[in-house]
């Protein structure tokens, strides 16, 4: 639990407990115990941090990417924080995946970064603010696109193949 709080600062109780499928009640108890012992801290907005100094504000993009990770956590063998522009790297079903957030207005910049040759680049799960952004994106190795609602609900999309004339 502490490892996840350190990796992904600013997550909610619901997100942290979902890392432990079928043990969510135990995870909730552990979270309360760690909070009481002063090993973790909870901000006024209900987000958890490993120390008080880090509580400067939750990273909205990271939080949305964690919701995507949690959507298939039962298939994930390993996960960790990624290197920009990927927020999270994970192995699932023997494949490497990068979960990449693309905020509105940053499409061109991030697409250019992702088109640079990369050694061992995995499949990319692209998290967008709005499904309309998908048509603006040309991303190599994109396994799929998704949006995340405020409540953590993930909606998945595939980019339609372009028709040849």
Locate the predicted segments by residue.
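Short acidic, hydrophobic short linear motifs in intrinsically disordered regions
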Residues: 7-20
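Hydrophobic residues on short alpha-helical segments
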Residues: 2-5
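Short amphipathic alpha-helical interaction segments
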Residues: 20-36
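Short phosphate-engaging motifs
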Residues: 12, 26, 132-133
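Long, low-complexity, charge-rich intrinsically disordered regions
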Residues: 63-165
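Intrinsically disordered, low-complexity N-terminal regions enriched in serine/proline/glycine
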Residues: 19, 47-48, 96, 156
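Short, cationic-aromatic polyanion-contact patches
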Residues: 12, 42-64
């Amino acid at each position: 639990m502490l490892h996840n709080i350190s990796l992904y600062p600013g997550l909610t109780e619901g997100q942290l407990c979902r890392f432990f499928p079928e043990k969510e009640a135990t995870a909730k108890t552990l979270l309360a115990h760690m909070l009481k012992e002063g090993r973790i801290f909870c901000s006024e907005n209900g987000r958890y941090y490993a120390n008080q100094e880090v509580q400067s504000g939750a990273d909205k993009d990271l939080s949305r990417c964690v919701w995507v990770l949690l959507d298939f956590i039962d298939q994930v063998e390993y996960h960790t924080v990624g290197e920009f522009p990927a927020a999270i790297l994970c192995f699932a079903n023997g494949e490497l995946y990068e979960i990449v957030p693309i905020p509105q207005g940053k499409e061109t910049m991030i697409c250019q970064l992702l088109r640079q040759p990369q050694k061992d680049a995995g499949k990319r799960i692209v998290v967008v603010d709005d499904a309309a952004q998908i048509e603006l994106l040309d991303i190599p190795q994109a396994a799929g696109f998704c949006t995340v609602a405020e409540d953590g609900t993930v909606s998945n999309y595939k980019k339609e193949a372009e028709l040849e004339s």
